[in-house]
From Swiss-Prot:
Its EC number is 1.2.1.3. NAD(+) binds at residues 146-147, 223-224, 246, 379. It comes from Staphylococcus aureus (strain Mu50 / ATCC 700699). It is an enzyme of class 1 (oxidoreductase). Belongs to the aldehyde dehydrogenase family. This is Putative aldehyde dehydrogenase. Pfam families: Aldedh (PF00171). It catalyses: an aldehyde + NAD(+) + H2O = a carboxylate + NADH + 2 H(+).
């Protein structure tokens, strides 16, 4: 049992103002594995005051000083690798190999990318007799999701530290352990008091007062659209800057000249990775009618090889859904797909055989899906694929963009000219060609209802900066 009932405020582990706690459940076993404080407004106020007190001092640190701080964080993060991997497997249910290869590594990559971005980032620019200055925005509130406990937290923290902005972090109450380890890392390497503050709790007790606090100048949130909308409403009262990374319903366009086995393997991975709990999951797979039958045969073969099971067993590729609530939501979407007339091609409702304990879902494929069906329009956040056929490229692009979301898109094929045309035509913040992968120095964010602003690398740093023009500075 992990007992993390203290908050980290102003460089110290302190008792929460609240006597309440939140239990953390291992989704693979349905057992309580720890608890964290259920913080309240008083905790938030104390954390914001600590951050505000150090704001001017931290803002005026040099780039070299902030790079040195990030260097120390990187080294200690690497020292805590096993602790981070174990915590994520416990709280999220991610297979150990995934926790190490993806979750741990992505968190590390963002600290490195922010440090490297500072090598060439210009905080000042001369324009004739005038000067343009970019300076830290001030106290920033960070609210992070449960599906990537280190990635989503590290990318925000790294950018804020690089910019010189102190923060108050509220991690997800479902996966808070990784954030506590990050706090321990920052404490050990000597992050200045007040620069980093951790307040555990739920949205009502911590998220709301953080979003409304008059001394918080910027809110950075990753999560659902409805919650993002509420944060914007609260932040609008005093015109805070807001950065949002929200949901997605990403298209994966398969071209007719593709290697079918390669395409089936790639699209399978994009749906089952992290048990489908990925905002960029390519869950709408668009396939040319002319290769549909061959593609589906290979797709079924690829899905049949996916091993769902105990995240601590060797060979497990897919772990459980995060919670009973989320498991039930995935089941409801699968049933909705059947009700609306989509053809169940693989998987379906219920749990995989032999996995009655834990929130395990069956990887599922629907075919003959109309893009207006619920399963093709709404984010499921589970291992559920919708296969949609198209007749020509224009139709594929039209279907791909027929969504309220625009976080990511994918295309796979051989003809470079066609690949480039599709990539430029998809309305999304990130498009991957032939499984190229996303590097941590590339900007990340969404079009339409997938969010506002950009994260990662120098673009992420800029979210935590204000721009000042000083006329006549060089006269």
């Amino acid at each position: 049992m992990r007992d993390y009932t203290k908050q980290y405020i102003n460089g110290e582990w302190v008792e929460s103002n609240s006597n309440e706690t939140i239990e953390v459940i291992n989704p693979a076993t349905e057992e309580v594995i720890g608890k964290v404080a259920k913080g309240n407004k008083a905790d938030v106020d104390k954390a914001v005051e600590a951050a505000d007190d150090v704001y001017l001092e931290f803002r005026h640190t040099s780039v070299k000083e902030r790079q040195a701080l990030l260097d120390k964080i990187v080294k200690e993060y690497e020292n805590r690798k096993d602790d981070i991997v174990q915590a994520i497997t416990d709280e999220l249910g991610a297979p150990l190999s995934l926790s190490e290869r993806v979750h741990y590594q992505m968190g590390l990559n963002h600290f490195v990318a922010a440090r490297d971005a500072l090598d060439n980032y210009e905080f000042e620019e001369r324009r004739g007799d005038d000067l343009v200055v970019k300076e830290a925005i001030g106290v920033s509130g960070l609210i992070t999701p449960w599906n990537f406990p280190t990635n989503q937290t590290s990318l925000k923290l790294a950018a804020a530290f690089a910019a010189g902005s102190p923060v108050v972090l509220k991690p997800s109450e479902e996966t808070p352990f990784a954030a506590v380890i990050l706090a321990e890392i920052f404490d050990k390497v000597g992050v200045p008091k007040g620069v980093f503050n951790l307040v555990n709790g739920d949205g009502a007790g911590v998220g709301n007062p953080l979003s409304e606090h008059p001394k918080v100048r910027m809110m950075s949130f990753t999560g659902s659209g409805p919650t993002g909308s509420k944060i914007m409403e609260k932040a609008a009262k005093d015109f805070k800057k807001v950065s949002l990374e929200l949901g997605g319903k990403s298209p994966y366009i398969v071209l007719d000249d593709v290697d079918i086995k390669e395409a089936a393997k790639a699209t399978t991975g994009k749906v089952v990775n992290n048990t489908g709990q990925v905002c960029t999951a390519g869950t709408r797979v668009l396939v040319p009618n002319k290769i549909k039958d061959a593609f589906l045969a290979e797709l079924k073969e690829q899905f049949s090889q996916v091993r769902v099971g105990n995240p601590r067993e060797d060979g497990t590729q897919v772990g459980p859904i995060i919670s009973k609530k989320q498991f039930d939501q995935v089941q409801n979407y699968i049933n909705k797909g059947i009700e609306e007339g989509a053809e169940l091609f693989y998987g379906g409702p219920g749990k995989p055989e032999g996995l009655e304990k834990g929130y395990f879902a069956r990887p599922t494929i629907f075919i003959n899906v109309d893009n207006q069906m619920t399963i093709a329009q709404e984010e499921i956040f589970g291992p559920v694929m919708s296969v949609i056929t198209y007749n020509d490229l224009d139709e594929a692009i039209q279907i791909a963009n027929d969504t309220k979301y625009g976080l990511a898109g994918y295309v796979i094929g051989k003809d470079k000219e066609t690949l480039h045309k599709v990539a430029r035509s998809i309305e999304a913040g990130t498009v991957e060609i032939n499984e190229a992968g996303r590097k941590p120095d590339l900007p990340f964010g969404g079009y339409k209802q997938s969010g506002l602003g950009r994260e990662w690398g120098d673009y992420g740093i800029e979210e935590f900066l204000e721009v000042k023009s000083i006329a006549g500075y060089f006269k």
